[in-house]
Amino acid sequence: SPAQTQVNAALKRSGEAGNSVPSVDVKGYFASAAADTTTARIGSGTTIILTGNAFIRAKETTDLTAVSGAVAAGGVGAGGSVAVIILNGTTQAEIQGTIRAADTVSISAENTINGSSIQAKVGTAGLIGALGASVAYVDVTGTTGVLIGSGASITSGRNTTVRADLTVKASPVTSGASVGWAAVGLAASRLCVSGTTSILSVQGSSLTAENGNISLTAL
């Protein structure tokens, strides 16, 4: 089944089971994929002139909750519990026009991911043998960035700050217990962050701080 295929793929990608990865019959399963886009954009031909500060911010906050559980009992039991979350969205601040502020110019793209309750639980019991597996897997891909286009002009009277920031606070947790004459349990949890955090100032763009500093930070 499609669910079974995804479960087995998650087991392999978890990286915790070595080269020997058992196939798990799905008893409890949770899967979610998100590809949201959050953008703050100053378009080409737009001119903004301010006597104070200029703040342009794209901000995305995602709170994750996933709980999957299974219990199996009998002469020969098999129970598997998998929680899989994949985030591949985009958070971007894009400047294509002109911004001029007498004070500070601040441009930021912020992506915050919170996941304090991501759990895969499994319990099995059998007289002859039992196989229990629990996998909690969170994969953060996607892009967090600031793009300053070729025709963009940014001028501040003081400081100009540009920041792209990806913050991940997620703790996938697995728990498993098996009891029997012969029992095997697999528990694997993994947080994989492979996304891109970047600031791109295209050739032809202009950043100026008349009486201060220019700061570019990608975290």
What are these regions (language model features)?
Residues S1-L219:
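Low-complexity, glycine- and small/polar-enriched segments
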